[in-house]
Amino acid sequence: LLAKNIFVFGQCMEGTQFYGLFGMVLSLYRQNKFPGIGQMFRYTLRDESNHIELFRNLFMDLIEENREIWTADFKEELRQTMAEGIRLEKDFIRDCLPVNAVGLSIEEFLTYIDYIADRRLEGCGLTPLSPGIKNPLPWLAEMMDIKKEQNFFEGRVTEYQKSSALHGSSDDEL
């Protein structure tokens, strides 16, 4: 039970499900919109990456120390749990992004969730759900690649416009 819970939290939730929201915000950041929020999400992703790897290592150590739980049934249970997490994340994406918008193709983003989930499964020694799938959003990987030694407090202050400077802007421009 502990190994499954660690897998669910580290690989399904933090490792896959958080990426829907992160990707949407980072797509705005990529377009120079909401630079401060985008940078904060990049710092958050740096921390999430550490959590994902920590929980993956803990999971793998538990499996190594308790080989008797690493059965075909347990492996399939984990894969099906990931499949349910993917389904829920895709529903979230469809709700947040009902049409192609903010420089993001819904289909590419849904495919990205399959891609990232398969990476998490493979990292835990499990068979992917969508073998051979390619990363449809390579820019997202680049956005997530933040220097580990970069410190929030040492970063440059991002400039913001006053709301009065946006007067006359339509929602489509934002």
Kindly give the residue locations of the regions a language model identified.
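Non-heme di-metal
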Residues: L1-L174
